[in-house]
Swiss-Prot record:
InterPro entries: Ufd1-like (IPR004854), Ufd1-like_Nn (IPR042299), UFD1_N1 (IPR055417), UFD1_N2 (IPR055418). This is Ubiquitin fusion degradation protein 1 homolog. Residues 245-276, 318-342 are annotated as: Disordered. It comes from Caenorhabditis elegans. The lineage of its organism: Eukaryota, Metazoa, Ecdysozoa, Nematoda, Chromadorea. It comes from the Eukaryota. The gene is ufd-1. Functions at a post-ubiquitination step in the ubiquitin fusion degradation (UFD) pathway. In association with npl-4.1 and/or npl-4.2 and ATPase cdc-48.1 and/or cdc-48.2, involved in the cytoplasmic elimination of misfolded proteins exported from the ER. This pathway, known as ERAD, prevents the activation of the unfolded protein response (UPR) caused by the accumulation of misfolded proteins in the ER. PANTHER family: UBIQUITIN FUSION DEGRADATON PROTEIN 1, UBIQUITIN RECOGNITION FACTOR IN ER-ASSOCIATED DEGRADATION PROTEIN 1. It is found in: Cytoplasm; Nucleus. It holds the Pfam family UFD1_N1. One of its GO terms (cellular component) is nucleus. Belongs to the UFD1 family. Keywords: Cytoplasm, Nucleus, Ubl conjugation pathway.
């Protein structure tokens, strides 16, 4: 075979006739190839190249067919067309050995007639393939796998279903789109490869939790006021409320203390005589509500409409003072002087 190719190349240098190769052959599958081994049959079936007789090589060299040799295959009965390369010139005379998938694509059976013509195809720049089974999703790096498997093909034709072998199983791909033409050569070219979702794949709908825009209401202010009084006033004595001055009053002139009651303030500006006693059980702060419907992918930072404790205490004092109608004083009653009137 190498001698034939050398003779053909020599004929091209000397100047052979230029034309299109066009022949008719009887087509058979790889199992009909004489002395075919199982590895040889798999090599043919999982590729895009055919076997032609040795006489075809002589004609191809005489016609000065450029390399790589590409062919257009036509089933004249149903007018189906595809394209391929050539693997060897070892087929029986008058016969062409085609991969099984190519015979199915053209609607051919063993013993049918096929027309084979030489073809010139542009280099591929883009190819989109659609996996025909969900097993494709188990491939870790599909582009790397196809980069190796597509080396067994010389060209691609739109709407062809090409098989590849991966991990002992057959994966089929439908050629969905090609650029710059519907039939392209994929030998020694850079192809941008893309994939459609596999056949039978159903994408699960995504559940999106709406974002929280309004601020939730803050707990009652009395919870914080009571907590502050308990924390600041207990001091380890066990008392819930404190007095500014404790004990009985004494006069410097020895007289007894007047019977009028003196109301004291508890330090907050509110009279203890009118203030309600603080309960032992303070109102609890409302528990934090956990968003059990939270889905990963969105983090919500909630800002409660809180106010500082000193601001709340000031507002509470002003509110109590407005209810009493007059500002509160620590000491009430008439004033006294230690000196006699002049």
């Amino acid at each position: 075979m190498q001698a034939w190719i050398q003779q053909g190349l020599h004929g091209m240098q000397m100047g052979g006739r230029v034309g299109n190769y066009d022949q008719t052959f009887v087509v058979y599958g790889p199992v009909f190839l004489p002395n075919a081994t199982q590895s040889k049959i798999s090599e043919i079936n999982y590729g895009g190249k055919i076997l032609l007789p040795s006489s075809a090589l002589n004609l191809l060299m005489q016609y000065n067919i450029p390399m790589p040799m590409l062919f257009k295959l036509t089933n004249m009965a149903v007018q189906r067309v595809t394209h391929c390369g050539v693997l060897e010139f070892s087929a029986p005379e008058g016969q062409a050995i085609l991969p099984l998938w190519m015979m199915q694509q053209l609607g051919l059976d063993d013993g049918d007639t096929i027309r084979i013509e030489s073809a010139t195809l542009p280099k591929a720049t883009f190819a989109k393939l659609k996996p025909m089974s969900l097993e494709f999703l188990n491939i870790t790096n599909p582009k790397a796998v196809l980069e190796v498997e597509l080396r067994k093909y010389a060209c691609l034709t739109k709407n062809d279903r090409i098989p590849t072998s991966y991990a002992g199983q057959t994966l089929e791909f439908l050629v969905v789109d090609l650029k710059p033409a519907n039939s392209v050569c994929i030998i020694e070219c850079d192809v941008n490869l893309d994939f459609d979702p596999p056949e039978g794949y159903v994408e699960q709908p995504r559940q999106v939790t709406p974002a929280v825009t309004a601020k939730p209401p803050a707990p009652d202010a009395s919870a914080f006021i009571g907590a502050g009084q308990k924390a600041g006033g207990s001091g380890g004595t066990g008392q819930n409320a404190t007095s500014v001055f404790g004990g009985a009053g004494r006069r410097l002139d020895g007289k007894k203390k007047p019977s009028s009651s003196v109301s004291l303030s508890d330090g907050t500006g509110v009279s203890t005589s009118n203030a309600a006693p603080v309960a032992n059980d303070l109102p609890a702060i409302p528990p934090v509500v956990v968003n059990e419907d939270y889905k990963p992918g969105r983090v919500s930072f909630l800002r409660y409409d809180y106010k500082r404790v000193d601001v709340l205490e000031k507002e509470l004092r002003e509110k109590e003072a407005s209810k009493a109608g007059q500002p509160s004083n620590v000491f009430r009653g008439g004033n006294r002087t230690l000196r006699g009137a002049r």
